[in-house]
């Protein structure tokens, strides 16, 4: 969008002073705000409500606004934090429950990240769970990465953004949604009515009538649009409906012709979308009215902030610009005087660091898979952009340091009203970013080396073929995708070397990746899973397992292969739904109880036994999975449900021990560590946590000692049920990946040691744990560590197993337990000596073979000659092959070129190239020569100009590869010698 002509109410230019880079001047009519602090007015509740705000009613009215009133609204604080607060207050005053943003890591398995405000309400829209409130409002953190290349280039593309939304679950519908959207826009936010346009679905006459007759929007500013633009669907079938969008007009003076295009982003910006979920689309394409009509809306915070703050683009709002100002300071440039390329780089870094900070805060660490790859890719793009701005090191004198942590600190400083938990995790977030940046800088160096190699290869091939040298598009994409090398930089370096790039091939690879990204990020699917049908019309299961291990219950449903049945007999695999159960269903990292369902025989029913091996939850319905061991089970019959008490005790011990482990970790290595996953099993516990290095032996010992001391203190556990807000205020830690009821959560406390929100089963007293032992600590991903441990009965079994192993080891080595270490070290030393002796013998044998074949060397050239030897040495390993080549170079007269190959074992090829100084001086390099030969054997390699090694996996191709090496050497050397 070209903003050079945008008047935006004739906004004044914003002065940027490098001495005060965080200052933002919005307008003389708006509150001035700096990035260093939050306007105090944001924290204060309104003392009065405007008469224009109408209480929630089925007959909403829109009041006319006087010019004085409009000026009053426009003079309000329009900082991003204030806009967010005003939106939530607006809908709270109309009966909406204000709910917190959900995590960027969604519970929905169909999407990688939270991409829309409606995602946390998807089960309600599907009718899978009952609504807890009739309507709600949120400010949802969102991530979208399907259009990364446009970030920073357009006025409003982002990876991280906030979506303000109001939602109705069968409460109000189209009329109220439309009128409140208009009130919010023109009265609360004071947008001039003649600048707001609306779009509707082409067949939605109801929406047209509301906009025209009840709201009063002129017909020329209501645009009917087709299904592609204004009809929302969740997939081929399922909930769907028309939508209506609000657009802001930057140029009303251009008129209201029929051919006005709302997609013209030089004139319009869409800022509010209203989805009227009123139909169910059947398999045959029919639209059936939904019994419960829903409303799903989204207003982009960054977009409305751009409009209200009167700045040319989203990036210059107070939500993002303070971050840009910090980056400008690090780069020692002025944003206002920077060229377009530099401005784009500043915007990209600011945008990506917002996304990275909130993703890491929500438990996503950089890695090569899934969400972790998103974080890694964003950090790498930010590092590259920083390099293009001339940012070296941390800009504090350390050229090998990282600059992104300073940017992250600014993001965290602005996070108070987006996610208050971010500041509590600041040290971990910053450290993960620092480590990833430093790691990538090393990768970038390797990428530069690879580019140099690829360009040399391109020039070498062109020299032989007499064609124009070019870099393959796949190679350019490899540099971009794996090493984070911008194609623009690749093109610049290539041009300097006289090499062009196959951009068509590069674009093909980019498009393939883009399609994959869009498939993973672009759609929120509303589909009713099979388990929803399985449990339809079944009441919630009453859980009795905290207080009892057995209970009488009634069979409500039986399922075989997901289909309901009335009766199952011996040998059947079955899923049993009961009205009440003592069985704990797998959740919160704790595995499910095992046990039995018994049916006693009497005059009316047959005796039966069902062995339960797993219990899962579908919402609040427990599904007992097992096998009928004897007899038959029928719907409606009464059973005795009995949990295996020994296995339950093992789970309880390991679950409480997990809580103690988290507390000990925080005490020993720092409060910033946080849980990233867990497993509570019968035989062990596993705890994943965010940390950037391995734990030292003394730290592990201290953790063990702390936990065993707490166990010895014999402290009674306390459990209580509290509102979520009260539990958090009390200091309770939330478990990773869990979603909590706002009104009621279970708190498990070991007084003075640990307090966590937890629905799992626990011991009554820490003494029941008996003992605790860490059995391993390792890294499982970048920034993620894992501890495995045993406690209670599993601890005793572990110790007994170790004792048994030691007894067998002592018997084998014929030493006492205290002498095992010395004996093993002596054996290892003897083994090393034997291996060295064997290696020396192999090398001597290879050297002997080399001496024998040296007479096969032939000469190339006439006036000046070079000796060439290309031979196969069967059954010679790579090290011995190297020794043979070194011997030949030292014994044959310079200049000499030697290439040797071998297949030392099945599916393995070893190659070596050794060129004397006389050959290298002609410009023939071993490192470059060996690569194409190795490719023929299904491998690769490289090295120095005088010596290189390579390998492969196709020994059957070795003879032809060596023949190719012989031909190429002769041709190349003949040409060099003239």
From Swiss-Prot:
Its catalytic activity? tRNA(Ala) + L-alanine + ATP = L-alanyl-tRNA(Ala) + AMP + diphosphate
> What Gene Ontology biological process does one annotation of this record name?
alanyl-tRNA aminoacylation
Pfam families with a match to the protein in the record: DHHA1, tRNA-synt_2c, tRNA_SAD
| Residues that coordinate or bind Zn(2+) | 655, 659, 758, 762
UniProt keyword list: Aminoacyl-tRNA synthetase, ATP-binding, Chloroplast, Isopeptide bond, Ligase, Metal-binding, Mitochondrion, Nucleotide-binding, Plastid, Protein biosynthesis, RNA-binding, Transit peptide, tRNA-binding, Ubl conjugation, Zinc
The record's InterPro entries line, in alphabetical order, gives:
aa-tRNA-synth_II/BPL/LPL (IPR045864), Ala-tRNA-lgiase_IIc (IPR002318), Ala-tRNA-ligase_IIc_anticod-bd (IPR018162), Ala-tRNA-synth_IIc_core (IPR018165), Ala-tRNA-synth_IIc_N (IPR018164), Ala-tRNA_ligase (IPR050058), Ala_tRNA_ligase_euk/bac (IPR023033), Ala_tRNA_synth_plant (IPR027522)
Q: Which cofactor does it need?
A: Zn(2+)
Q: Name one GO cellular component term.
A: mitochondrion
Its annotated compartments are:
Plastid, Chloroplast; Mitochondrion
**Covalent cross-link (Glycyl lysine isopeptide (Lys-Gly) (interchain with G-Cter in ubiquitin)), residues:** 773
Give a GO molecular function annotation for the protein: tRNA binding
The record's cofactor note says: Binds 1 zinc ion per subunit.
Look up keyword Protein biosynthesis and say if it applies: yes
User: Which sequence ranges are marked TM in the entry?
Assistant: none
Q: In which broad location class does this protein mainly occur, judging by the first location in its UniProt entry?
A: plastid
For this protein, the record's Gene3D superfamilies field holds: 2.40.30.130, 3.10.310.40, 3.30.54.20, 6.10.250.550, Bira Bifunctional Protein, Domain 2, Threonyl-trna Synthetase, Chain A, domain 2
Q: Does the keyword Cytoplasm apply?
A: no
Q: What is its EC number?
A: 6.1.1.7
Knocked-out gene: effects: Embryo defective. Developmental arrest of the embryo at early cotyledon stage.
- Per the record, what about its domains? Consists of three domains; the N-terminal catalytic domain, the editing domain and the C-terminal C-Ala domain. The editing domain removes incorrectly charged amino acids, while the C-Ala domain, along with tRNA(Ala), serves as a bridge to cooperatively bring together the editing and aminoacylation centers thus stimulating deacylation of misacylated tRNAs.
Record-linked NCBIfam families: alaS
Q: How does it associate, per the subunit comment?
A: Monomer.
What this protein is reported to do is described as: Catalyzes the attachment of alanine to tRNA(Ala) in a two-step reaction: alanine is first activated by ATP to form Ala-AMP and then transferred to the acceptor end of tRNA(Ala). Also edits incorrectly charged tRNA(Ala) via its editing domain.
- Which family, according to UniProt? Belongs to the class-II aminoacyl-tRNA synthetase family.
Mind telling me what this protein is named?
A: Alanine--tRNA ligase, chloroplastic/mitochondrial
Which organism does this sequence originate in?
Arabidopsis thaliana
């Amino acid at each position: 969008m070209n903003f050079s002509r945008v008047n935006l109410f004739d906004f004044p230019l914003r002065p940027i002073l490098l001495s005060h880079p965080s200052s933002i001047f919005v307008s003389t009519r708006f509150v001035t705000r700096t990035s260093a602090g939050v306007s105090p007015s944001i924290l204060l509740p309104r003392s009065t409500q405007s008469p224009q705000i109408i209480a929630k009613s089925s007959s909403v009215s829109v009041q006319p606004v006087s010019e004085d009133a409009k000026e009053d609204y426009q003079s309000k604080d329009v900082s991003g934090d204030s806009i967010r607060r005003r939106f939530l207050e607006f809908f709270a005053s109309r009966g909406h429950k204000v709910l917190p943003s959900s995590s960027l890591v969604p519970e929905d398995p169909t999407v990688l990240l939270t991409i829309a405000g409606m995602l946390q309400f998807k089960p309600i829209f599907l009718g899978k769970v009952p609504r807890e409130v009739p309507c709600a409002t949120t400010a949802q953190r969102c991530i979208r990465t399907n259009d990364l290349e446009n970030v920073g280039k357009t006025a409003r593309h982002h990876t991280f953004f906030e979506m303000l939304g109001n939602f109705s679950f069968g409460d109000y519908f189209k009329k109220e949604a439309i009128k409140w959207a208009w009130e919010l826009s023109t009265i609360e936010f004071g947008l001039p009515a003649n600048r707001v346009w609306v779009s509707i679905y082409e067949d939605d006459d109801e929406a047209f009538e509301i906009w025209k007759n009840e709201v009063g929007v002129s017909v020329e500013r209501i645009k009917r649009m087709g299904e592609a633009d204004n009809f929302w669907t969740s997939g081929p079938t399922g909930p769907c409906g028309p939508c209506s969008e609000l657009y802001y007009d930057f140029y009303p003076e251009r008129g209201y012709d029929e051919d006005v295009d709302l997609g013209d982003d030089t004139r319009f910006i869409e800022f509010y979308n209203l989805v009227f979920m009123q139909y169910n689309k059947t398999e045959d394409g029919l639209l059936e009215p939904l019994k419960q009509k829903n409303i799903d809306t989204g207003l982009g915070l960054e977009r409305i902030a751009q409009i209200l703050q009167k700045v040319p683009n989203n990036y210059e709002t107070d939500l993002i610009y303070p971050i840009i100002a910090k980056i400008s300071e690090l780069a020692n440039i002025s944003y206002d005087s920077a060229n377009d390329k530099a401005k784009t780089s500043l915007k990209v870094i600011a945008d990506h660091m917002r996304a990275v900070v909130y993703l890491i805060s929500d438990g996503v660490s950089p890695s090569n898979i899934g969400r972790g790859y998103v974080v890694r890719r964003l950090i790498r793009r930010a590092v590259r952009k920083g390099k293009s701005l001339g940012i070296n090191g941390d800009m504090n004198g350390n050229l090998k340091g990282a600059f992104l942590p300073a940017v992250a600190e600014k993001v965290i400083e602005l996070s108070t009203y987006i996610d208050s938990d971010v500041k509590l995790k600041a040290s971990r977030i910053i450290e993960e970013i620092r480590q990833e940046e430093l790691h990538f800088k090393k990768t970038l160096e390797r990428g530069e080396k690879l580019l140099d190699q690829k360009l040399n290869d391109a020039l070498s091939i062109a020299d032989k073929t007499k064609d124009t040298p070019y870099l393959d598009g796949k190679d350019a994409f490899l540099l971009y995708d794996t090493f984070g090398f911008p194609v623009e930089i690749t093109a610049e370096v290539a041009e300097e070397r006289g090499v062009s790039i196959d951009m068509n091939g590069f674009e093909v690879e980019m498009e393939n990746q883009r399609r994959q990204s869009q498939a993973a990020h672009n759609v929120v699917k509303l589909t009713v899973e099979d388990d929803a049908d399985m449990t339809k019309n079944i009441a919630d299961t009453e859980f009795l397992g905290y207080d009892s291990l057995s209970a009488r219950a009634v069979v409500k449903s039986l399922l075989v292969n997901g289909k309901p049945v009335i009766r199952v007999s011996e040998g059947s695999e079955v899923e049993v739904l009961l009205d009440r159960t003592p069985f704990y269903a797998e959740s919160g990292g704790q595995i499910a109880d095992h046990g039995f369902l018994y049916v006693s025989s009497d005059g009316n029913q047959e005796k039966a036994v069902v062995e339960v091996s797993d219990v899962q939850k579908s919402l609040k319905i427990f599904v007992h999975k097992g096998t009928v061991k004897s007899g038959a089970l029928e719907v409606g019959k009464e059973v005795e449900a009995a949990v295996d008490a020994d296995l339950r005790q093992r789970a309880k011990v390991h679950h409480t021990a997990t809580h103690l482990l988290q507390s000990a970790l925080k005490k020993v290595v720092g409060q910033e560590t946080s849980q990233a996953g867990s497993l509570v099993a019968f035989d062990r516990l596993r705890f994943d946590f965010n940390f950037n290095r391995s734990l030292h032996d003394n730290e592990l010992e201290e953790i063990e000692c702390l936990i065993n001391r707490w166990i010895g203190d014999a402290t009674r556990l306390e459990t209580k049920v509290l509102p979520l807000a009260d539990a958090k205020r009390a200091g309770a830690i939330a478990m990773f990946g869990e979603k909590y009821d706002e009104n009621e959560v279970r708190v498990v406390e070991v007084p003075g040691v640990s307090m966590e929100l937890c629905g799992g089963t626990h011991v009554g007293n820490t003494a029941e744990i008996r003992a605790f032992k860490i059995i391993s600590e390792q890294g499982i991903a970048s920034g993620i560590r894992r501890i495995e441990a045993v406690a209670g009965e599993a601890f005793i079994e572990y110790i007994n197993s170790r004792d048994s192993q030691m007894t067998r080891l002592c018997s084998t080595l014929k030493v006492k337990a205290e002498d095992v270490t010395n004996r093993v070290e002596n054996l290892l030393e003897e083994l090393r000596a034997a291996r060295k002796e064997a290696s020396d013998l192999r090398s001597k044998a290879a050297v002997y073979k080399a001496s024998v074949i040296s007479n096969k060397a032939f000469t190339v050239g006439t006036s000046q000659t070079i000796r060439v030897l290309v031979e196969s040495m069967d059954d010679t390993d790579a090290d011995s092959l190297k020794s043979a080549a070194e011997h030949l170079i030292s014994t044959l007269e310079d200049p000499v070129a030697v290439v040797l190959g071998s297949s030392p074992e099945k599916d393995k090829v070893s190659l070596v190239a050794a060129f004397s100084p006389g050959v290298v001086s002609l410009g023939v390099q071993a490192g470059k020569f060996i690569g194409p030969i190795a490719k023929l054997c299904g491998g690769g390699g490289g090295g120095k100009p005088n010596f290189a090694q390579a390998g492969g996996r196709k020994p059957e191709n070795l003879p032809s590869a060596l023949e190719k090496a012989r031909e190429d050497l002769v041709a190349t050397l003949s040409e060099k010698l003239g």
